[in-house]
């Protein structure tokens, strides 16, 4: 299990949301439940392949692949991005992807 701690998060507000349920202006209220669930999934995972299920996670290794940076979907707009190396999650953050339509 990864057992997420403060040092695994890039941003303090996301750690405080995960650990204490603190809200923040950077986290939309419609994300609270699903974001908490996704963070729990990451924390409970034994290895990176555990995050392939459910398929709605859309686990993806981002380019360049040698950087070992992954993303999982929170919803259509938001992803959790993190580095996975040596069976450890680091630099975990919430990314509000901006679409240029």
From Swiss-Prot:
SUPFAM superfamilies: RelE-like (SSF143011). Signal peptide: none annotated. InterPro entries: HigB-1, RelE/ParE_toxin_dom_sf. Pfam families: HigB-like_toxin. It comes from the Bacteria. It comes from Haemophilus influenzae (strain ATCC 51907 / DSM 11121 / KW20 / Rd). PANTHER family: TOXIN HIGB-1. This is Uncharacterized protein HI_1250.
């Amino acid at each position: 299990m990864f057992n997420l701690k403060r040092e695994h998060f890039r941003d303090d507000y996301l750690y405080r949301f995960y650990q204490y349920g603190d809200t923040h202006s950077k986290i939309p209220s419609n994300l609270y439940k699903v974001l908490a669930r996704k963070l729990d999934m990451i924390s409970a995972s034994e290895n990176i392949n555990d995050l392939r299920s459910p398929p709605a996670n859309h686990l993806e290794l981002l380019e360049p692949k040698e950087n070992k940076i992954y993303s999982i979907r929170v919803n259509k707009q938001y992803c959790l991005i993190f580095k996975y190396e040596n069976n450890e999650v680091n630099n975990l953050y919430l990314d509000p992807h901006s679409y240029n339509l």
